[in-house]
Amino acid sequence: LVINSRTLPRLPWVSLIAQKKAVILRDEQLVTSNFYDMRESGGQMQLRVNALGPGYVYLDGEAINTWEGHLPRLLFFFALDRPVVTRSEICQAFWPDLENDQAVNVFHVTKRRLHKALNFDVLVHDGGYYRVNPEVAVQHDITEFVGALVRGRMPETEDKASAWQKAIDLYRGPFLQGHSDQWIVERRAQYQQGYLEALSEMARIRLAEGRQEHALGLLLRAVGENDRYEPIHRQIMQLYADLGRRSEAAAHYQNLLDQLKQEGKTPEAETQTLYTAIIS
């Protein structure tokens, strides 16, 4: 299914692309950068935004530390999540339990604090929507991260290793680490999925080069990020077996089995079949 994103500007396209659930086309060409057509250079001000990890914002090279609480900062990250956003969507994400009038009042207070922290109106209202001020140049690590994922997936990309490695390098930690808002938790899982994909694909490349230990290190790194994604566990078990380290493959399976038992779960059938084949 191909959708013209101009008709649905309120969808979080970048996170959909990270999950391989969408692509953006322009004149039949796959878009691999600047998915929201934001100014990236030459603006009146230059913002550098790092959302992978704790979340930092830099204005003209200087870190912003005058947020007056976490809400103004998170409001800015939320505004970057999609091309445009409505006030109703903001209030629902941040203050779902407040009456509408109360939520609107808190929103305006938060927006004023955001503008005060950056010393200019970073959010502008246009046609019923809020969006990041088009006069501001924004460099966003999420855009760069997802762009690297797209290039790694493209069949025509010659140096896939560079694309996957760039995605790995840009992932400095979980999205807005330390926050537990529902929209943040959802995005965190989606971008983590892209990171696991990059690690897994990079491991495949290293295996093809005969660099098995390097590949194993990448896969173990993926498990350290998310120890519930069984396809990665199967890759690790198979690699241990290929290296002649069947006891380590069996131990890895037993660790996974113990973790799942604590949750009342069992390994996937494919994982159990692989384990049986390795120890037989």
Regions inferred by a protein language model and the residue ranges of each:
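DNA major-groove recognition helices of helix-turn-helix
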Residues: 71-76, 90, 107-120, 132, ...
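Conserved AAA+ ATPase "SRH/arginine-finger" region at the nucleotide-binding site
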Residues: 23-33
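Short boundary/linker motifs that mark transitions into or out of structured domains
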Residues: 31-71, 121-131, 173
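Structural recognition of the conserved hydrophobic beta-strand(s) that form the central parallel beta-sheet
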Residues: 1-6
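Short regulatory helix/loop adjacent to the ATP-binding pocket of P-loop NTPases
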Residues: 7-23
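Short amphipathic alpha-helical recognition elements used for nucleic-acid or partner binding
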Residues: 62-94, 111-114, 231-236
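Intrinsically disordered, charged and Pro/Gly-enriched terminal/linker segments
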Residues: 65, 80, 99-104, 127-280
